[in-house]
Regions:
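Bacterial Sec-dependent N-terminal signal peptides
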Residues: 1-45
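Beta-strand-rich, non-transmembrane domain signature
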Residues: 41-300, 370, 383-389, 393, ...
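Secondary-structure boundary elements
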Residues: 303-376
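Extended, non-catalytic structural segments that build the interaction scaffolds
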Residues: 332-336, 481-483, 586-591, 611
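A carboxyl-terminal module marker
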Residues: 522-683
Length: 683
């Protein structure tokens, strides 16, 4: 709620859900329209009235009757001071005012918070004018306890200063209220405002005033519609200093007010949701340009500028242009026997993947020099993949780093480049007409494969091409094929199970088998089997070949004793529960890949038994045919043939399609529970 994700933070870019965000420019675009677009309102008055006995009347609120706390209002106002530091520095001032009703002790954490956490320096924000009160209702009267210095604790950790606030006399039903002012030096940063947090908010409002000489891009994100979206222009005149220009600027200011009413709490993660960062309602800002009395400067970063910046950084691209002679001798051995550029690339990739330990820390920047990574054989994701890029270049291959945002980090807005949108580095190598994308940071990833987390939209090559690289989940289809054969034999009723997994499931299982044995894996499967089923001769196919899809198999034997057998033809692949069981969903369905699951079973009818009941065949599909489920079964006197297939052809389902996909999976769950009923033939 409010500024950033805490109370005081510098402007920071948080990833934007591309389908639910848009960018507008202020004030340059808005200055083209001189009339006021709408009159500013002050609808927050009912919420910001004094605390009275009526404030304590509700024991719950209709917005969320189970909420442990409710934000009664959260209001921020940003203004500018053109005369900071005797006119030589421009600054923005944020004034924040918030009132919270604490309904349950589980929300008492809101009464203790860090007021500020920053490193001292000329670019650090300053905080003042803090005021706080605790209100309680006692004997029918409102009792106010004002905070004083004894409620504010100052801590120092190195050069990091922190101020911790603890509200006194907090009890269930209390109201806490506080306000403060933050001054941000400079004109480049307007603080991000979040309208949504862990608790419901009755009113959240952001009111900013900026001079039209500054041109900001504004990015909106979220699903709620503004109840206030106002614009007011005013005449202004003040001294400014830009470069060689010093004088009086005459122009206008623009005031923007955005407000949301009855904002629900940010819900917990739901199945098939990337990250809540994609869905929180918020506004953030980025300076594009300054236009002042003939002084013009562009601040918006282009991909050309961002690439140039990254390639010059010591902890990213600077060493990629070096010859790195310390690699010479070792690489002769590593690439020995490679007869083509692709073979050389495969040998390099395999060596880095198999000989370097990654701590799985994600980020754009190296934690150490490439030479130290080479010597220590360990590092973070950027260390290892930038080393891979450097080695490829050393060997004459056309290699470049690629930056992307992982699914857990959130969506990046590709047409508005900001480094904060990206948190992962991979390597791209161009061989003729083919581009190979490589990630050597994980031992279970094959050549030319990327982990599931990388498929999250556009990635960018950091080289002279500035190439967009599409890594959308819709582009990946995870295919799984399972075949089961059950036969009457001289040794009894036996069968074989074979399953070929797709790329991502193969990665998951290989990673799992780094922590447990093959026997442990199959023992966990055995525990899910019926008591009349035994397993032996189990194993994996291509376990130690990460490039290959991983298969597994086992042999089984049945000992039927009962007169009636309820036999489910789907062994391990059925949905035991609907992944979309919630009657109401708050965020779109975001699957990591498309699905093509095929399951085939051919079984002899066990000797001495007959088919008493067979499920009916069925075929259903979603309205747009993006999801299809087939369940086909038939039997004759001796054999049962069964085939089921689930196909999902798209990965993102908006909220208005949720009920349909929920019903679709409910049908699948119910259908896959239906057994084949076999009865013993009476003599």
């Amino acid at each position: 709620m409010g500024v950033g994700y805490g109370f005081f933070q510098y402007f920071q870019v948080v990833n934007i859900l591309s389908m639910k965000c848009y960018v507008v420019l202020i004030p340059v675009l808005l200055c083209c329209c001189c009339p006021i677009l709408s009159s500013a309102q002050d609808p927050s008055d009912p919420y910001m009235a004094d605390v009275t006995t009526q404030t304590f009347a509700p024991t719950a609120y209709s917005i969320d009757s189970s909420a442990a706390a409710v934000i009664l209002f959260d209001v921020g106002a940003v203004s500018f001071n053109p005369n900071a530091n005797n006119g030589h520095q421009f600054s923005y001032i944020l004034e924040k005012h918030i009132r919270i009703r604490l309904l349950n002790k589980s929300a008492f954490n809101l009464a203790t918070f860090t007021l500020s956490a920053y490193r001292k320096g000329p670019a650090s924000p300053t905080i003042d004018n803090f005021k706080g009160e605790t209100y309680n209702l006692e004997d029918g009267k409102v009792v106010t306890i004002r905070l004083d210095k004894s409620n504010i604790f100052k801590d120092q950790s190195g050069d990091l200063s922190m101020e911790r606030v603890v509200f006194p006399n907090v009890k269930e039903g209390s109201v806490i209220e506080y306000s403060f002012r933050v001054t941000y030096p400079g004109f480049q940063y307007i603080p991000t405002w979040t309208f949504q947090g862990s608790y419901p908010e009755l009113w959240s409002e952001y009111d900013i005033t900026v001079p039209t000489l500054y041109d900001y891009a504004v990015r909106h994100q979220g699903y709620q519609k503004y109840v206030v979206d106002s614009v007011i222009y005013s005449d202004a005149m003040f001294p400014i200093n830009f470069g060689n220009f010093s004088g009086t600027w005459t122009g206008r200011t623009i005031r923007r007010i955005w407000a949301l009413k009855d904002v629900p709490a940010l819900e917990k993660m739901e199945p098939y949701t990337t990250t809540l960062r994609n869905h929180i309602s918020k506004i953030d800002f980025q300076l594009k340009a300054v236009h002042a009395n003939g002084y013009d400067r562009t601040y918006r970063t282009t991909w050309n500028e961002l690439t140039d910046e990254l390639l010059k950084r010591d902890n990213f691209g600077a060493s990629l242009g070096d010859r790195n002679r310390w690699l010479d001798d070792d690489l002769k051995t590593i690439t020995m026997g490679a007869g083509s550029p692709r073979q050389r690339l495969q040998k390099i990739f395999t060596y880095v993947r198999d000989h370097f330990d990654c701590n799985n820390v994600e980020g754009l920047y190296m934690s150490q020099s490439l030479k130290k990574v080479w010597e220590d054989k360990k590092g973070n994701v950027a260390d290892i993949n930038l080393l891979l890029t450097a080695i490829c270049r050393h060997e004459g291959l056309d290699a470049s780093p690629v930056i992307l945002s992982t699914r857990q980090h959130g969506y990046a807005v590709d047409d508005y480049p900001l480094l904060g949108d990206y948190n992962y580095v991979i390597t791209r190598v161009q061989l003729g007409d083919s581009a190979w994308l490589l990630d050597a940071s994980k031992p279970y990833i094959g050549f030319g494969q990327l982990p599931e987390l990388c498929y999250n939209g556009w990635a960018r090559a950091i080289d002279s091409s500035f190439a967009q690289i599409p890594l959308f989940p819709d582009s990946m289809t995870e295919t799984r094929l399972t075949t089961v054969e059950l036969n009457n034999t001289d040794s009894g009723y036996t069968g074989t199970y074979n399953r070929d997994n797709g790329i991502f499931e193969s990665m998951t299982i290989r990673n799992r088998l780094r922590k447990e044995t093959v026997d442990d894996f199959f023992e966990s499967l055995r525990k899910t089997m019926a008591d009349y089923k035994q397993m032996d001769q189990y194993g994996f196919d291509s376990l130690n070949v990460p490039e290959a899809d991983l298969g597994w198999h086992y042999r089984m034997k049945y000992n039927f004793r009962n007169g009636t057998i309820y036999f489910n033809p789907i062994f391990h692949e059925r949905f035991n529960a609907n992944p979309f069981n919630a009657p109401v969903r708050h965020y779109p369905v975001e699957m990591p890949f498309c699905i093509n699951n095929i399951y085939v079973l051919n079984m002899d009818i066990p000797r001495g038994y007959r088919v008493d009941q067979l499920p009916q065949s069925q075929r259903v599909k979603l309205e747009d045919s993006s999801g299809i489920f087939e369940y086909l079964i038939s039997a004759d006197d001796s054999v049962i043939h069964f085939r089921t297939q689930l196909t999902i052809r798209k990965t993102n389902y908006p909220l208005d399609e949720y009920q349909e996909i929920r019903d679709f999976f409910s049908l699948i769950v119910a259908k896959e529970k239906e057994p084949i009923v076999l009865k013993k033939i009476k003599p």
